[in-house]
């Protein structure tokens, strides 16, 4: 599934991805390509994920991800075929990798072309709540709430 909001700049070779993200690891991973970063559940065998809390142990144990960013204490919960990237701070490392795949997500600027829905032709056609803005490429389908 593609990301509707931001362009994915991948794929990246894992060694290049870690280098661009300023993540130093002792492991010498093969030059495998990583296509995206996803959560533990949806990551597949060409993607990287992250595991930062014991609360997600059950999900981590069945992830299909090619690589997983985690801590040394949580790594034992991952499947054997998932390459572990051991870091001190999982969330910081995840943010760095996300920035590499989706650099525009870091500077998601406000869209100055949005309009107050009260000042559009939709005003009398639909029900809406407070503080609703409409921007470019917005489509309202049937039965939207």
Spans of features found by a protein language model:
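Domain-scale signature associated with acetyltransferase and cell-envelope carbohydrate enzymes
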Residues: 1-145
